[in-house]
Curated annotation (Swiss-Prot):
Residues 63-72 have a biased composition (Basic residues). Belongs to the protein kinase superfamily. Ser/Thr protein kinase family. CDPK subfamily. Residues 374-404 are annotated as: Autoinhibitory domain. The keyword Kinase applies. The modification Phosphoserine is found at residues 274, 541. This is Calcium-dependent protein kinase 16.
Length: 571
């Protein structure tokens, strides 16, 4: 799917690059977004400026933007939604029964118009029975000229159904249809867009305390989506509405028109999103849930300083900034912003998605968590994925990770402590097979059979007592790439300390005998050593050990663990 953005020349941001020497105007936003599907139909061009524009006052879908990466300037085909197949007289959407209720007119009365676009309109409506006011998106079936347009509508309804009940997602009530239209009935949000509140603030900035409250709510949405195997793909201030005009009103995510489901380990290869918020890996056509976290990092940066972290006069220029440059944390007001806030934003704007904080990890960060409750932190899908991968690692890789886990301090383990506590339901300090089953066998994008869950617990349970304690959990759940990216000096220290647990004589190498002594493995140890011995000198150097820790999947090298192993002690 292709993307095309509104002209970046009309937008402003934070001047960082030497190629952009001119000061930026105040934060304003131009939205000009050709619609992707009937679910994303707000196609009007709006100049956002707090001096002249009224606030939005209801739940209304806005068309997500599509763009092209700077390299190659390749634009993908976009099928015209107004075109029809040769000989086709009835639009595809009018020939399809969506399976939705057919009694909309009997249940609701349409009121004032809230917004409109190429595919339809959004209205205030009233429930005839209860008198409750709702938002109704009316989508014209005649505009659904191709099957994918119908699938987009069905997918968005499915997503809204899945997320309904989350405190920070606009509530879905029902979907209806008649011969001409589809009606999506949702919660009415009358507090306006997050974007409008940013623009209304002095210098378009939030206080740190207020910004943290907003960011925490966005992260909760992202974490819930990711746990369900869903990526929002268009996180930006325009897609968050306040329930009411009250200052402490909850924030509600809306516009899931670009959202899609993804299986663990898979990537999206199309380019979707909005220029200022798009992640580097999206432009490289290899994106996943991490891209949502990047977008929240951009929003966090804007909330704190009133400027965009990546800016240029053209869209291609913005993309180059995103791919090559780092955000500026030196100019005002950053010197007056807390180190904790800066650390948080930096860890969300890491260009390598593997080293970026996950949404659930970010919720454990001290800057966001202050005033929050650990019980509010959801299970991190990446932690569950790491545990699933741990069983696939060779014995040597598992032992190395256990050694590394013992070198980390409480601050470094704060997010994993939250995750452990979330899985340890009975709070007895260990994870049982049943608790592991509850965490791994839920309605995730994948469901594991009981035998598979037992296999994972057995692999993590290094002392074979039938439970997983916190140390064992850390070894299996660690994000090694993050350790190195966030603090390279600490990474050097921690990885060396882990290496020295194997290097018993302190000569700077791990020999086969030292490997046997540390692991307690019986039988031939050479196959295990050869796995990490890149230069084939019969021993493992510190550099080779670090490479072992970084390697994604050691078993892909087809090295078999020695038979008859026996774990003599816990690492």
């Amino acid at each position: 799917m292709g993307l095309c953005f509104s002209s970046a020349a009309k937008s402003s941001g934070h001047n960082r690059s030497s190629r952009n020497p001119h000061p930026h105007p105040p934060l304003t936003v131009v939205k000009s977004r050709p619609p992707r599907s009937p679910c994303s139909f707000m196609a009007v061009t709006i100049q956002k400026d707090h001096r002249t524009q009224p606030r939005r006052n209801a739940t209304a879908k806005k068309t997500p933007t599509r763009h092209t990466p700077p390299h190659g300037k390749v634009r993908e085909k976009v099928i015209s939604n107004n075109g029809r197949r040769h000989g086709e007289t009835i639009p595809y959407g009018k020939r399809v029964d969506f399976g939705y209720a057919k009694d909309f007119d009997h249940r609701y009365t349409i009121g004032k118009l809230l917004g409109h676009g190429q595919f339809g309109y959004t209205y205030v409506a009233t429930d005839k029975k209860t008198g409750d006011r709702v938002a109704v998106k009316k989508i014209d079936k005649a505009k659904m000229t191709i099957p994918i347009a119908v699938e987009d509508v069905k997918r968005e309804v499915k997503i809204l159904q899945a997320l309904t009940g989350h405190e920070n997602v606009v509530r879905f009530y029902n979907a209806f249809e008649d011969k001409n239209s589809v009606y999506i009935v949702m919660e009415l949000c009358e507090g306006g867009e997050l974007l409008d509140r940013i623009l209304a603030r002095k210098d378009s900035r939030y206080s740190e305390r207020d910004a943290a409250v907003v960011v925490r709510q966005m992260l909760k949405v992202a974490a819930e989506c990711h746990l369900r195997g869903l990526v929002h793909r268009d996180m930006k201030p325009e897609n968050f509405l306040f329930k009411s005009t009250e200052e402490d009103s909850p924030l509600k995510a809306t516009d899931f028109g670009l959202s899609d489901f993804i299986k663990p380990g898979k990537k999206f290869h199309d380019i979707v999103g909005s220029a200022y918020y798009v992640a580097p890996e999206v432009l490289k056509r290899r994106s996943g849930p991490e891209s949502d976290v990047w977008s929240i990092g951009v929003i966090s940066y804007i909330l704190l300083c009133g400027r965009r972290p990546f800016w240029d006069k053209t869209e291609d220029g913005i993309f180059k900034e995103v791919l090559k440059n780092k955000p500026d944390f030196r100019r005002k007001p950053w010197p007056t912003i807390s180190n904790s806030a800066k650390d948080f934003v930096k860890k969300l704007l890491v260009k390598d998605p593997r080293a970026r904080l996950t949404a659930a990890q970010a919720l454990s960060h001290p800057w966001v968590r202050e005033g929050g409750d650990a019980s509010e932190i959801p299970i991190d899908i990446s932690v569950l994925n790491n545990m699933r991968q741990f069983v696939k690692f060779s014995r040597l890789k598992q032992f190395a990770l256990r050694a590394l886990a013992t070198t980390l301090d409480e601050e470094e383990l704060a997010d994993l402590r939250d995750q452990f506590d979330a899985i340890d339901v009975d709070k007895n300090g260990v994870i049982s097979l049943e608790e592991m089953r509850q965490a791994l066998a839920k309605d995730h994008p994948w469901k594991l059979k009981d035998a598979r869950v037992a296999e994972i617990l057995q692999a993590i349970d290094s002392n074979t007592d039938g439970f997983v304690d916190f140390g064992e959990f850390v070894a299996a759940a660690l994000h090694v790439n993050q350790l190195e990216e966030h603090d390279s000096e600490k990474w050097q220290q921690r990885s060396r300390a882990a290496f020295e647990k194997f290097d018993i004589d302190g000569d700077g190498f791990i020999t086969a005998e030292e490997l046997r002594m540390h692991t307690g493995l019986k039988g031939s140890i050479e196959p295990l050593l050869e796995e990490a011995d890149i230069d084939n000198d019969g021993k493992i150097s510190l550099q080779e050990f670090r490479r072992l820790l970084r390697t994604a999947s050691i078993k892909s090298r087809n090295v078999r663990s020695p038979p008859g192993y026996l774990i003599s002690r816990k690492v």
